Amino acid sequence: MLIKEYHILLPMSLDEYQVAQLYMIQKKSREESSGEGSGVEILANRPYTDGPGGNGQYTHKVYHVGSHIPGWFRALLPKAALQVEEESWNAYPYTRTRYTCPFVEKFSIEIETYYLPDGGQQPNVFNLSGAERRQRILDTIDIVRDAVAPGEYKAEEDPRLYRSVKTGRGPLADDWARTAAQTGPLMCAYKLCKVEFRYWGMQAKIEQFIHDVGLRRVMLRAHRQAWCWQDEWIELSMADIRALEEETARMLAQRMAKCNTGSEGPEAQTPGKPSTETQPGTRTAGTPDGPEAPPGPDASPDASFGKQWSSSSRSSYSSQHGGGVSPQSLSEWRMQNIARDSENSSEEEFFDAHEGFSDSDEVFPKEMTKWNSNDFIDAFASPTEVEGVPDPAIMATKGIEDEARAPRDSEGLDGTGDLGVEACSVHALFLILHSGSILDSGPGDTNSKQADVQTLSTAFEAVTRVHFPEALGHVALRLVPCPPICAAAYALVSNLSPYSHDGDSLSRSQDHIPLAALPLLATSSSRYQGAVATVIARTNQAYAAFLRSSEGTGFCGQVVLIGDGVGGILGFDALCHSASAGTGSRGSSRRGSMNNEMLSPEVGPVRDPLADGVEVLGRASPEPSALPAQRTSSDMANPDPDGSQNSLQVAPTVTSGEPRRASTASCPPASSEAPDGPTNAARLDFKVSGFFLFGSPLGLVLALRKTVMPALEVAQMRPACEQIYNLFHAADPCASRLEPLLAPKFQAIAPLAVPRYQKFPLGDGSSLLLADTLQTHSSLFLEELEMMVPSTPTSASGAFWKGNELGNEPAAQPAAPSTTSEVVKILDRWWGNKRIDYSLYCPEALTAFPTVTLPHLFHASYWESADVVAFILRQVIEKERPQLTECEEPSIYSPAFPREKWQRKRTQVKIRNVTSNHRASDTVVCEGRPQVLNGRFMYGPLDVVTLTGEKVDVYVMTQPLSGKWIHFGTEVTNSSGRLTFPVPSERALGIGVYPVRMVVRGDHTYAECCLTVVSRGTEAVVFSIDGSFTASVSIMGSDPKVRAGAVDVVRHWQDSGYLIVYVTGRPDMQKHRVVAWLSQHNFPHGVVSFCDGLTHDPLRQKAMFLQSLVQEVELNIVAGYGSPKDVAVYAALGLSPSQTYIVGRAVRKLQAQCQFLSDGYVAHLGQLEAGSHSHAPSGPPRAALAKSSYAVAAPVDFLRKQSQLLRSRGPSQVDLEGPGTPPTTLARGKTRSISLKLDSEE
């Protein structure tokens, strides 16, 4: 849902405005109703009493919007969905209006309005809650200074020019509001507009469109008309208005009755004639407040509306569905099955702090869109961009840092820090190469592209604010508009339809467009290389404009490219040309020597059929030289060296001074430069770290080039970037894979699934590294892959070292040449060290949609997808974290000790076919006292095997932010598998939290824990996990639910400066399960205590552990949370009843010993924030203890087995805690890393 509050000022009294408003409505309804497909029916218009606002007038209308919806979207909807109902309660000066659709049940528009005699200064006239105020966007509409769309401008409706004959008012100057505030009269319409369209892939785009065009644009024009029509209504009374309303209702009823007689509905749009109509929501929101503004003129709909949704031919329902299924029922089934998943969540899907929302709060504020409507409206009045001369103002889209200016770390950001601190707050710049859908037919609309980028920016801000606060304000997005290269191909293919000659034929609406052919035809055009050169130039312009801007001053972060379906193809070739020009991101001669024969495999001087449009259809036969099939393979391998007409048009190669890779000798050299193509100087002026493709058919294009030029090796077309990510939906007819082109055997390996954001906002623990995939699917590539894997301190399931080290590190055992050459060849051919193909979730119901509608739907879905945004942020933030230089200690990449033979021969036999279940206890030590680490090394889920007499290496991350592990020593396990390691006194650690990893020397499995060093008197809060957090009982089965608001309460105590201690009566063999549960729900980091093995008295062990904290560590426990069983434990610690909080029903005999939180954590949190505990603790400061999310992660294998890992952090937490200080790197739990880091890779 998108919420905006509009303030509309007019220089008139409230009584005058009431008459003006009602007169305007009936007049516009009369003028703009043309019948079927466009018009208004008034079903009821009667007074009411004791309703919204007291007594007023109730109106019930039906708007017919069929002719205002694009053909591709209309193909999804039945006729019933082409009507919008309006119910309005007008109790002036308060009105309330609601718009619904009889068919689209998850669509609604609600508008509340107060008309007050002021200048719009009241901050909260609707009495919104704190959460609603944070979601609300304020927007003031100025009837004089705000520009209207060029197609709607009329001089007689311009307040700057209008002067009333009867009243003498006008014209209005730009400072009219200030003058009216001093002299009067002046009134303001406060309008709170809530728009919701909760359907997959379309929500953000349609909600934004309705607000910024359907609501704001209509309200602006309607109020300009109300002012300029005052000579018509100034002498009317309310009785005259009611009479006009009744006359209008009768006239509209007669007009609609005539049109409904014998009408079959709006005519289907024909292929090849793109629609210029509006998207749904234009007339749906036609009257932004019932008695406010009816639909715009139907006779001449503004073309800019249609450009918001790229339109194509309408596809009727195919006969494959069978005659027994009606189009009406089929459409209903389609729309119901793509409703947002959040609406279909079962009770098993538990969200933190869900119960804390009021009826007016939104459960999903990540869908809220922050959007500058003034910029959008101004764009309508700006002239169309001249091809090749992009407007820098349009290209520069506002970054996330402008959307949410959260408080940041003061170090280096205020300009007063050390000189070595980076001055620019932006660490990652995203350049979006936006060309549009492959079915776009026009030259491309910059406003639509800008809206898509703004939607993506909003998604970035929402996801970052909740789960990546350390990136808030450090990411910027910029638009790079790309030429719509598929437009000519689409026009050509549309006219090749078997039914193109018969515009009235019903079969013409069938889906006869071969979607896969469009990018192939587009990239074969002689103008394609010119388009690539244009993209390179515009990208450099956008980058330079960012550097010149205030937010880009001093920028030295990473640059990431994002390309949509067509923009991805152009961006790939731009990167390939940059690599061939010697500016590859890795700077190697191998990368820099590639030429660009792949850019356009067509015959050079042949006339371009796509450029000529449909004129080629009149030819009897094409020229022989225009047929690429007539060129033999020998011609392609040995082109005419003198650059004759039969030579291939290719991009220029690098200069002769650069070495050429031997494997490229078979590729034809460039013999001539393509007209208007990239030149030697055309290259990107910056290094690209990553390139994300959104549903791009790049794989098909590369396959065509490989077919046309057999000598071309696709793997050698190395783009000048460090990594490519090919994101697509499995049901997308335009998408294709890339990995099988680089290594054919990858056709048998499924693409990696991008985790769902609702379940895994921080990733599901799956490794993205190519090396891990090669090891997992070793049977496809070689028989002895494990022989060449370098020795690493990792789990048995796979390595977490850098994937590109697999050919460079010495093997633990000698490998056969055939073994290593196959894997090294794959690693050498790969574009990066991670997987390339990634599959996104989409509803299964999309497979039943008409194929011609899918490109538009999928193209829109990427910009609002939280799955996509979270995936991108995980990759970019991982790269932004500190990296070591080559001169630093190499233990971060290479363990101090490789795998060795087991000390005991029986060990190999004992641990066969069992998985490790090692664990180490979290240790809390008072500063200055001995620091001792303890661990236990077992195998099997129930500790069936003990690791006895084996070496274990102890690593400690002494500087958690650096990710650098230091080897502290080696110990040998005893007969019970236990290990005790005293930290040497000369290496004793200071106050702080230090991750510890104990790695078994024999198989490199490991246990993890944290060593926490505190000062005397540190204050702490204790939470019993099973007693205070879980809302359901689960011993060994599915994950228990989290009590609503539990995470918020713990985070409040942590933010107040207290040490968090978690205790549980579960045995330590369940540590991985419990820790993974805490991590997935994003509980704040703390010390975790388990029972030592199975015990009949877990409460006694809890009490002993807490007593040791009080007596030995000298902690001061100020509060305890748990169940009624924990009351005695906390009482033994000396906690008073006011410090003991018990969750659940009150027990009468314990009421005097504790405080029962019968109303739940949400109410308790409000008391904490308003009470005495909201201040910082009185003990000594502990700035070194990081305020972060839970950091110790469970092994990968365990996380993968979880069937339902629920949403980790409710959005309400951010609303309650505010922007706050971003947590440190320790906030991201990690299961496996290329550098033994604990920060999340995926």
Swiss-Prot record:
Family: Belongs to the PtdIns transfer protein family. PI transfer class IIA subfamily.
The record's account of how the chain is modified after translation: Phosphorylated on multiple sites by CDK1 at the onset of mitosis. Phosphorylation facilitates dissociation from the Golgi complex and is required for interaction with PLK1.
An example Gene Ontology CC term for this record: lipid droplet
Species per Swiss-Prot/TrEMBL record: Rattus norvegicus (Rat)
GO molecular function annotations of the record: calcium ion binding; phosphatidic acid binding; phosphatidylcholine binding; phosphatidylcholine transporter activity; phosphatidylinositol binding; phosphatidylinositol transfer activity; receptor tyrosine kinase binding
DDHD domain span: 684-878
Protein name in the entry: Membrane-associated phosphatidylinositol transfer protein 1
SUPFAM superfamilies in UniProt: Bet v1-like (SSF55961), HAD-like (SSF56784)
Bias kind Low complexity: ranges: 299-319, 581-593
Reaction(s) catalysed by this chain's protein: a 1,2-diacyl-sn-glycero-3-phospho-(1D-myo-inositol)(in) = a 1,2-diacyl-sn-glycero-3-phospho-(1D-myo-inositol)(out)
UniProt subunit comment: Interacts with PIK4CA and VAPB. Interacts with PTK2B via its C-terminus. Interacts with RHOA. Has higher affinity for the inactive, GDP-bound form of RHOA. The CDK1-phosphorylated form interacts with PLK1.
PTM annotation (Omega-N-methylarginine): residues: R1209
GO biological process, one term: phospholipid transport
Intracellular or extracellular location(s): Cytoplasm; Golgi apparatus, Golgi stack membrane; Endoplasmic reticulum membrane; Lipid droplet
PANTHER family attached to this UniProt entry: MEMBRANE-ASSOCIATED PHOSPHATIDYLINOSITOL TRANSFER PROTEIN 1 (PTHR10658:SF40), PHOSPHATIDYLINOSITOL TRANSFER PROTEIN (PTHR10658)
Pfam families the UniProt entry points to: DDHD (PF02862), IP_trans (PF02121), LNS2_PITM1-3 (PF24694), PITM1-3 (PF24695)
Segments for region (Disordered): 259-330, 581-678, 1207-1242
CDD domains: SRPBCC_PITPNM1-2_like
